[in-house]
Amino acid sequence: THCISSAASDVYKRQIYKIEFYAAADGKEVMAEFLDSLPPKHQAKAFREIDLLERFGSSLKEPYVKHIDGEIWELRIRFSSDISRIFYFTWNFNTIVLLHGFVKKTQKTPRGEIETAQKRLLDYKSRHALTTQNQ
């Protein structure tokens, strides 16, 4: 007989995800800078949510993540009355690229924030397409 239940076995088979912070073509670490800009406790909560995303990937659902548009999803972070969002997409099945973060001030997500994420997604893909084809 097996010592490990099938449910426990499924945990071991779970897809392993890698988190990557988007950096601009000039090397500017825009995602790292956003996270550094958050107050310490809000930053800690953001890293906790990023850890959940890394562990569970596409199986993570609301209230943690929400589909925004096309390939773009948002990681939803709330600390006290502060709300922030991190837009991301999945690349090559198991790499989650964090594209753009912002502190949310209004009920509706500003279109400009989504557009920034979309531009960064296209930039990331254009710079990484060749390396993917060579693997």
Where are these regions (language model features)?
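Basic/aromatic recognition patch in beta-strand/loop cores that engages polyanionic ligands
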Residues: 58-107
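Single conserved hydrophobic/aromatic residue that forms the stacking wall/gate
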Residues: 1-12
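Structural signal for conserved beta-strand scaffold positions within catalytic alpha/beta enzyme cores
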Residues: 21-23, 98
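Well-ordered alpha/beta subsegment
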Residues: 104-135
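N-terminal first-folded block
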Residues: 24-67
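Conserved N-terminal entry element of GNAT/NAT acetyltransferase domains
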Residues: 13-21
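Generic hydrophobic secondary-structure packing signal
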Residues: 4, 42-45, 109, 113
